[in-house]
Regions:
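Bacterial Sec-dependent N-terminal signal peptides
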Residues: 1-44, 50, 250
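Subset of outer-membrane beta-barrel
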Residues: 40-266
Length: 266
């Protein structure tokens, strides 16, 4: 039969093992996620069909009016440091030298764990008539800002200089290109984000590698007998050359004069 002192020693050893295991898990996460990140960098939205300029600069100015969008995404609600994304953007068309152009501006703030990704981008597109539709060629230039909140990392008594326990940040330039073809009833777009694959240094020992990401999108408008109803299927495929994601959406849209209501599933 164990006495109280032996039981206390056993419990202390188990507690110590739990602390060591916790530190090991934290260090492993930092090794995978802080030293060099090679995952898809951009956030995804279920309403991608209304936010095409966020991944294809050639889509700016495709509407005949000023277009302003704002989106907020919250994942894993209730968990500490859960992913949160906010984006606001605006674009509009204009005419110059007998050509239609598009210009846009977007601001994004994306928080994932102890990382904060920010992007400020300016977009431009040139539109030309082609085969009964409109072909748009777009370019986007911007600034990426990265921050890691190391002050919230608990490594216990460890003093390993590879793991920052203070706030570190860095920035870099970013370049994206896109093509967008729009016909009467359908459209297709192809774009590449982060073409320069920038590497952003976070302090003296860590870096964030951002791989180029490619997007293919398309959609079709199916008119029904009711002139106010339209079925709009659409698709978005995203890949960085290693992993990929596909979104398939179907919407039923009711539109009468300036009023619009839709429902769908992705």
């Amino acid at each position: 039969m164990l006495d109280v002192s032996c039981l206390y020693i056993i419990m202390c050893k188990k507690f110590r093992y739990l602390i060591v295991l916790k530190r090991f898990i934290i260090i492993w996460i930092l090794l995978v996620g802080v030293l060099e990140v090679r995952a898809q960098y951009d956030p995804s939205y279920s309403h991608y069909f209304d936010m095409e300029p966020s991944f294809n600069p050639a889509a700016v100015g495709k509407q005949s009016k000023l277009n302003v969008t704002a989106a907020y995404a919250l994942d894993m609600a209730g968990f500490e440091h859960n992913p949160r994304t906010f984006q606001v953007a605006a674009d509009m068309p204009f005419f110059l030298f007998n050509h239609r152009h598009g210009v846009g501006l977007s601001l994004q703030n994306d928080q994932i764990g102890l990382f904060t990704h920010q992007r400020l981008a300016l977009q431009y597109a040139l539109q030309n008539k082609l085969l009964g539709g409109t072909l748009s060629v777009g370019v986007q230039g911007g600034m990426l800002s990265e921050k890691f909140d190391g002050s919230k990392v608990d490594l216990g008594e460890s003093s390993d200089p590879a793991f920052s326990t203070s706030d570190v940040n860095g920035s870099g330039m970013d370049l994206s290109l896109g093509l967008y073809y729009q016909h009467k009833a359908w459209y297709v777009g192809l774009s590449a984000q982060h073409l320069t694959s920038p590497t952003i240094n976070l302090g003296e020992t860590n870096e964030l590698k951002i791989d180029a990401t490619y997007y293919l999108t398309g959609g079709y408008n199916i008119r029904l007998r009711n002139p106010f109803l339209t079925i709009k299927p659409s698709v978005l495929v995203t890949t960085d050359g290693t992993t990929w994601r596909g979104d398939l959406t179907g919407r039923l849209v009711y539109q009468y004069e300036k009023r619009m209501l839709y429902g769908g599933v992705t």
